[in-house]
Curated annotation (Swiss-Prot):
Residues 19-80 form the LCN-type CS-alpha/beta domain. This is Alpha-toxin Ac1. Keywords: Disulfide bond, Ion channel impairing toxin, Neurotoxin, Secreted, Signal, Toxin, Voltage-gated sodium channel impairing toxin. It comes from the Eukaryota. GO terms for biological process: defense response. SMART domains: Knot1. It is found in: Secreted. InterPro entries: LCN-type_CS_alpha_beta_dom (IPR044062), Scorpion_toxin-like (IPR003614), Scorpion_toxin-like_sf (IPR036574), Scorpion_toxinL (IPR018218), Scorpion_toxinL/defensin (IPR002061). Alpha toxins bind voltage-independently at site-3 of sodium channels (Nav) and inhibit the inactivation of the activated channels, thereby blocking neuronal transmission. GO terms for cellular component: extracellular region. It comes from Androctonus crassicauda (Arabian fat-tailed scorpion). Has the structural arrangement of an alpha-helix connected to antiparallel beta-sheets by disulfide bonds (CS-alpha/beta).
Length: 81
């Protein structure tokens, strides 16, 4: 019974997941690494941010624990400027 109640609570309350990735603009272009990368990630709900090399994009801002509503780099989509 406890498992069923716990499952029901999770479904009712909802659980927002988090993920790591290169934060992007709506057009799937990365934010290039700037001194404020950590602040950018935190402002968008992440726990931290750092500079990392991304092939094809250069030095980009990598965020940890971003919420699902913040876009991250989709490798199957191109950056459209």
């Amino acid at each position: 019974y406890i498992v069923m109640i716990s499952l029901a609570l999770v479904v009712m309350i909802g659980v927002e997941s988090v993920r790591d990735g290169y934060i992007v603009y709506p057009n799937n272009c990365v934010y290039h690494c700037i001194p404020a990368c950590d602040g950018l990630c935190k402002k968008n709900g992440g726990t931290s941010g750092s500079c990392s090399f991304l092939i094809g994009s250069g030095i980009a801002c990598w965020c940890k624990d971003l919420p699902d509503n913040v876009p991250i780099k989709d490798p199957s989509q191109k950056c459209t400027r």
